Amino acid sequence: MVDVVSSDWLADRLGDVRVVDVRDGWEFDGIGHLPSAVSIPFDRFRSADGDVGMLPGRDAWTDLLSGAGVAADDDVVAYDDTHGVFAARFLVTALLYGHDPDKLHLLDGDFSAWNRERETTTEATEVEGTVYEITEPAETPLVDFEAVEAALDDSETVIVDTRDPAEYEEGHLPGAVNLDWRELVDDETRGLKPRDELDSILEAAGVTPDRRVVLYCNTARRISHTYVVLSHLGYDDVAFYEGSLTEWEARDGAVVED
C-alpha cells in the first residue's frame, strides 16, 4: 500500500528510488530541490478536461511521466512544501493509473523535513526519458456518484468530508462526518502526528479500520492526503470519490447544512 516515509528512510535509498518534486518549477529551480529529484509541477497532472474528475487522462499521464524519466516499475517518493497534500495527489494519481501501490511513498514532513537536515541543490537533474506504460489496476479505490449515493444508507460505511469545518457546515453529504485533512498533520514538523494521536482523532470521527471509508472533498485534492494516511495506517477498505462535491452538486446530489 501507499505509505509515508521519513527523510532518513529516503536518504538511505536515494540512489534506488525516483524522487518527484511537485512544487512549482520556479521553486524547484530557484529555492532548490532534493538531489536526483525530477520536477513534475502539480498543475501538470490536474485537468478538468482529462479523465473523470480532475485526473489528467491516460495519454497525458503517460507523456508526463515518460518525459520526467519515471518508469512504471520505479519506486517513487513524492514531496511538496504544503504538508504533503499536493504530493499525495500525485501518488494517488499514479495509483489510479496502475502504478504498484507498494512502490509509492510520500515524504513525511515535505521538503522542509529534508531541508532542515540535509543538502539540497539548484543544479538541474539529468533526465533520461522512459516509455511509461500504464497497467490497468486489478482493483481500484475509485467510486462514482451512484456508489456514493448507495453508501449513504450503509451502516457499515462512514462517509468522510475532508474539508475544513466552515466548508462542511455550509453543505455536506447527508450523514458525512467532518475530518479536516490538516487534523492529521503536525503544524510544527509538517509531517504526520504520532500514531496514537492519529488513531484517537480517527476514532473520534468514527473512522476505524473495521468500517468502509468513503472520502470526498471539493475536487479530490485534499482526500488524496487522507487516502495516503489511511493506507499508511493499514486501512484496507477506503473508497476515493474523484468527482467529490463538484460532481455531487452538479448531479443534484442531496446536500445538508449544519
Q: Language-model segments: which ranges?
A:
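Flexible, polar/low-complexity N-terminal or interdomain linker segments that lie immediately upstream
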Residues: 1-33, 108-172, 181, 255-256
